[in-house]
């Protein structure tokens, strides 16, 4: 093994049949810079520096695991591991030295081992196999609501009451479409990735007017590094809102771009109403243009063409624009409350390089299940199970939950489950707490 701090081989991948060079973690830690990234998977060391831009999930996603053991993330995100390993082989430059632990940083080796055994048990129980009937029903009820909304206006006219009912129904349809495209993005429905990708483009593009690539770019980072600043886009929201550790940091630096001690109040004005209508619409369009996602742009255009051609004859241009805004605002409320109730009240801060299980549990909690909550949240009330097993079809979360709860009990880890309304209120409480922490640091530190 080379001396500590030596950069290791850079001339190319390990030669087939030749003994693999060995590395210690101190050497690997030196390779977590832009343009110089190593990572470890199954104790093998890979140089992804030049290949990261070709990574299907994006260079940021794989780069977030620089100089880390990415074994559990690798297994969590990919369907066909043997197929993906073919792409890793040319990047192989060595392996961990025998005396090195499998993971750098805070590590509970027994927890990692037990989780991998649990993952295998879930596979043996066929919990990664989707129910075609379940997902066909989901798509069917989305399409039925789209038709029902149009029929209301067609049969009853564009009065205030039919329009309000139609907007409400379309908002539900849009919310459920978020859930279905989310399932497809995680490749949890079809056995072949290609079919998941194609179906996601249809649901995200034709039914919602957004880019599947854009969603996956954001969402996979969130799953890889939940609640980690500058790695999880969902919590990198300063200077509009301050969350977790950013509250103290902004306070100490005397930054006051907004009255953060009142952020739990202005959240109701610019959070739930405007996220989808303003932030997502602008960010999504910019992503498609900058990243030249022309196919996604065409899919999104097909949604707008269908929507406006369907309702323009009833409302005219000003009316159909107002109707569209109403649907987006209603949908946005659903999206914010449902997606944030499991994360915002949890630990939010900078990278701590934890193992997969510990990092996911620190950032997530569950909400008590019921038929309504399961449907309304797209089963995101089982957020712990979803984050540990992102490819698992959501109808199987309840089956794996007792096993996850037992794992947490064995290792003294928190398995938090809240009532639905408590989870919603905790979002506001968390924002107020962060604002108060900012104010105290601003005035006294």
UniProtKB/Swiss-Prot annotation:
What is the top EC class of this enzyme, as a single word? oxidoreductase
Q: What else is known?
A: A 28 kDa isoform is expressed in lung, kidney, pancreas and ovary (at protein level).
> Tissue expression, per UniProt?
Highly expressed in various organs and tissues including liver, kidney, brain, lung, pancreas, testis, ovary and skeletal muscle (at protein level).
Major location category of this protein? endoplasmic reticulum
**Source organism per UniProt:** Homo sapiens
User: Quick one: which pathway?
Assistant: Lipid metabolism; sphingolipid metabolism; Lipid metabolism; polyunsaturated fatty acid biosynthesis
Keywords attached to this entry: Electron transport, Endoplasmic reticulum, Fatty acid biosynthesis, Fatty acid metabolism, Lipid biosynthesis, Lipid metabolism, Membrane, Oxidoreductase, Transmembrane, Transmembrane helix, Transport
- Record remark: domains: The protein sequence includes a number of characteristic features of microsomal fatty acid desaturases including the three histidine boxes (these domains may contain the active site and/or be involved in metal ion binding), and the N-terminal cytochrome b5 domain containing the heme-binding motif, HPGG, similar to that of other fatty acid desaturases.
The record's EC number reads: 1.14.19.-
Q: Which Pfam families match?
A: Cyt-b5 (PF00173), FA_desaturase (PF00487)
Q: How does it sit in the membrane?
A: Multi-pass membrane protein
Output the InterPro entries linked to this UniProt entry. Answer: Cyt_B5-like_heme/steroid-bd, Cyt_B5-like_heme/steroid_sf, FA_desaturase_dom, Fatty_acid_desaturase
In the record, the note on similarity to other proteins reads: Belongs to the fatty acid desaturase type 1 family.
> What does the protein in this record do?
Mammals have different sphingoid bases that differ in their length and/or pattern of desaturation and hydroxyl groups. The predominant sphingoid base that comprises mammalian ceramides is sphing-4-enine (sphingosine or SPH) which has a trans (E) desaturation at carbon 4. FADS3 is a desaturase that introduces a cis (Z) double bond between carbon 14 and carbon 15 of the sphingoid base (also known as long chain base, LCB), producing LCBs such as sphinga-4,14-dienine (SPD, d18:2(4E,14Z)) from SPH. Prefers SPH-containing ceramides (N-acylsphing-4-enines) as substrates.
Name of this protein: Fatty acid desaturase 3
Q: Which segment of this protein is annotated as the motif Histidine box-1?
A: 182-186
Locations listed in the record: Endoplasmic reticulum membrane
Q: What is the lineage of its organism?
A: Eukaryota, Metazoa, Chordata, Craniata, Vertebrata
